[in-house]
Amino acid sequence: MPDSDITILLVDDEEMVLTSIRSFLAIETDYRVHTFTSPVKALQELDRLNIDLVISDYLMPDMDGITFLGRVKERFPQVPRILLTGYADKENTMKAINDVGLYQYIEKPWNNDDLKLIIRNGLEKTILLKRLEERIREVERAQNELTEVQKQILRIFA
């Protein structure tokens, strides 16, 4: 899948963080990046964006990142979710990883190379899942065709 076909949703209440990550990804990739300062607004737009990966801040005024990513999971369980946190609270982060099924978390300040690697690996998971879903659909189509051929053969010899 070309980078230009990939859509990332980025949610953080700090405009500087959004600008920094969006600018970095614009330089390093061709990903489409949609940014929101409000998780509530991001959820309102979620269905129309066709996202491949989500990055969310942990502490935000409207809704915390764990709740937001949990709601993303309810609607798009296959989409990797990454938590961006300014707190080295490993216990709560691990709880979030388990409870919400996070793909990964990144501590602020982040290293751009690490961020790029985590995003790339998360997207690879998405791409592999999409390929698997397509293969499953192909097998189902082939199975349906085979069933129809079997019915035709039975009618001919019946």
Where are these regions (language model features)?
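Active-site residues of response regulator receiver
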Residues: D12, D57, T85
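Two-component/phosphorelay signaling modules centered on CheY-like receiver
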Residues: E15-H34
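Receiver (REC) domain active-site loop signature in two-component systems and cognate sites
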Residues: M60
